[in-house]
Amino acid sequence: MAKKVAVIGAGVSGLISLKCCVDEGLEPTCFERTEDIGGVWRFKENVEDGRASIYQSVITNTSKEMSCFSDFPMPEDFPNFLHNSKLLEYFRIFAKKFDLLKYIQFQTTVLSVRKCPDFSSSGQWKVVTQSNGKEQSAVFDAVMVCSGHHILPHIPLKSFPGIERFKGQYFHSRQYKHPDGFEGKRILVIGMGNSGSDIAVELSKNAAQVFISTRHGTWVMSRISEDGYPWDSVFHTRFRSMLRNVLPRTAVKWMIEQQMNRWFNHENYGLEPQNKYIMKEPVLNDDVPSRLLCGAIKVKSTVKELTETSAIFEDGTVEENIDVIIFATGYSFSFPFLEDSLVKVENNMVSLYKYIFPAHLDKSTLACIGLIQPLGSIFPTAELQARWVTRVFKGLCSLPSERTMMMDIIKRNEKRIDLFGESQSQTLQTNYVDYLDELALEIGAKPDFCSLLFKDPKLAVRLYFGPCNSYQYRLVGPGQWEGARNAIFTQKQRILKPLKTRALKDSSNFSVSFLLKILGLLAVVVAFFCQLQWS
């Protein structure tokens, strides 16, 4: 008899968890509090309690080839970085392809998840839900929590003396939808993460002036990398990941600093991070430098105090006649349907084995999916988490002892602090490729490079030096997909397809030109050595 699994949430993590349950022969039921799938990526004009809310212009910071699910590439005509509506379209295609909607109960809120009396032997859970004012309860063999971590808006008003006197408008960035109504205003955006930067750039087109306050500074990256390819397809390779792991920390940090400053000098723009050697997640924004050059945005230090109409900053400067303050200060998360003894959230931190399993339970039948911030795409990360979790639920994979898991949690947290610092916004941060490989190893889906060097050297080279995308984890092991190898070799075609909207007469001239340059360079070298010999 198939084990019954409750999946809480029908966003990215919930959808892929449903598919993984079905793939493993489990019987899932998904509870989604709203009327549709998509989670944080589904734009709505109104703000809903307990749900993150995006602005209309949001696009992805990770590219389509690095963000698609491992056996379902995005259509080749999709742009590399997707508008939220386009990403939602992909989710709908995915859900239809694998017939996932039939497992979802919409407009159903999970009120509580409690252990059954015989949990120590059965591992079962009693799940109480509410829909249309009626409560229902059911028993499940396992639970996958997929409600995400963009839940409660974090507005630290106590850190801003005088906010109660401020006569203008102030609100959290989740309430911002579009620039209408902010024309001619003097606006202060507090917080320079991705949302704060996006909002500041968008408002600066029609506002009188936009200021952005950053406590520690930040690195700003372009989505466009070497030769015009998406940044993550260049940055996230196993070769580069290996270098970052084996080289001395000082060398790695120096390399990162050089890479970040290659686009523009962050010190000159007042953006250089206070602690350059903490690997804080960079801001992905192609417009910030130009808006700073135009003077449309001005970078400010931490706000020290607010008056009725002005902002006083820690460096002693004052900006008068502020009309609007937008707090782009992130989110905190909680699980109101779980007891603290199950998953305790403290200072925006949770103690979970590999960011997934509570270590202290008698039975490993509760898991959190997507409660992590990788330095890369969340989509393949959540997928590998779900693939592992469903195999644990089915009894095909096992977890180590509680003591071993607790030691891993402590060690992982120490490493996280060392790499990313102790900021509340970095509590879920982790390296990308390393974490994916770690999960893949648990289910036997990590490619064996030594073996591939002999069996398929061309593929081995692609895996090691090319983009580390999700297809790699469908080459071997459970859930092997026969289309994985082809997807790896055709990814460049899908990257370039949406860009080649203008037909060129003949691209062969480029090859000839390149060859002539090489021959010319060789001629110069030969001439140089000949001259040395004659002299």
UniProtKB/Swiss-Prot annotation:
Membrane topology: Single-pass membrane protein
Gene3D superfamilies given in the database record: FAD/NAD(P)-binding domain
Binding site for FAD: G9, A10, G11, V12, S13, E32, V40, W41, N61, T62
InterPro entries xref list: FAD/NAD-bd_sf, Flavin_mOase, Flavin_mOase-like, Flavin_mOase_2, FMO-like
GO biological process: energy homeostasis; NADP metabolic process; negative regulation of fatty acid oxidation; organic acid metabolic process; oxygen metabolic process; toxin metabolic process; xenobiotic metabolic process
Modified residues (N-acetylalanine): A2
Keywords, sorted A to Z: Acetylation, Endoplasmic reticulum, FAD, Flavoprotein, Isopeptide bond, Magnesium, Membrane, Microsome, Monooxygenase, NADP, Oxidoreductase, Transmembrane, Transmembrane helix, Ubl conjugation
E.C. designation(s): 1.14.13.-
Transmembrane segments: 510-530
UniProt cross-link Glycyl lysine isopeptide (Lys-Gly) (interchain with G-Cter in SUMO), position: K492
Domain of life: Eukaryota
Pfam families: FMO-like
Annotated binding of NADP(+), by residue: T60, N61, S195, G196, S197, D198
Cofactor(s) needed: FAD; Mg(2+)
Example GO molecular function: flavin adenine dinucleotide binding
Location relative to the cell: Microsome membrane; Endoplasmic reticulum membrane
GO cellular component terms, A-Z: endoplasmic reticulum membrane; membrane
Family that this chain belongs to: Belongs to the FMO family.
This protein's name: Dimethylaniline monooxygenase [N-oxide-forming] 2
Gene field: FMO2
